[in-house]
C-alpha cells in the first residue's frame, strides 16, 4: 500500500483487511492519485485513475441530465472480479475510490467497509489552512523559494 498523505494510511489499511479488496485507488476528481494498493505498475495506476475519474464525471453528468442526485456508487459485476467506483467529500475536496474485489466478498460488504473508511478519512483529514497571499515586498523571495522547492534546486 502507498499513500501520499500519512493520515490516509490507517483507514485504507483497515478497509483493505476488512473488505478483502484486491485493488484500491483513492484519487481526486481530476484523477490525481492519493493512495493505492495492489497495483504492480505505475502505468496501471495512472490509467485506472484517469478512467475512474472520467467514469465518475460522466455518470454525474448523466445524473444531472436525468434530474437525479449524484449516484452514490457505480458497481460493475463480473464472473471473477467486480469493480466499485464511489465519489465522496472530504475536507480536502471531493475524492473517488475505485475498488476491485473478488467473489470471496460481496458488494454489500465492500460498500459497508468503504463507507466506514470514508468516515474515518473525513475525521482524520487535517483541515487546510487558508493560504495567505504574498505581500508585494516578499513576492520575489517567495517566488524564488517556491521555484527552488518545485525544481529541487
PLM regions: where:
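Acidic, low-complexity cytosolic segments
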Residues: 1-21, 30, 34-153
Amino acid at each position: 500500500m502507498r499513500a501520499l498523505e500519512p493520515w490516509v494510511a490507517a483507514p485504507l489499511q483497515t478497509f483493505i483487511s476488512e473488505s478483502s479488496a484486491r485493488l484500491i485507488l483513492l484519487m481526486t476528481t481530476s484523477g490525481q492519485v492519493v493512495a493505492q494498493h495492489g497495483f504492480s505498475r505505475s502505468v496501471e495506476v495512472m490509467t485506472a485513475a484517469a478512467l475512474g475519474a472520467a467514469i465518475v464525471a460522466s455518470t454525474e453528468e448523466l445524473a444531472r441530465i436525468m434530474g437525479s442526485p449524484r449516484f452514490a456508487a457505480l458497481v460493475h459485476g463480473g464472473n471473477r472480479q467486480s469493480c466499485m467506483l464511489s465519489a465522496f467529500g472530504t475536507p480536502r475536496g471531493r475524492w473517488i475510490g475505485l475498488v476491485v474485489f473478488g467473489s470471496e466478498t460481496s458488494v454489500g460488504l465492500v460498500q459497508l467497509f468503504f463507507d466506514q473508511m470514508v468516515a474515518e478519512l473525513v475525521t482524520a483529514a487535517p483541515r487546510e489552512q487558508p493560504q495567505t497571499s504574498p505581500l508585494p515586498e516578499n513576492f520575489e523571495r517567495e517566488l524564488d523559494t517556491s521555484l527552488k522547492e518545485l525544481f529541487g534546486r
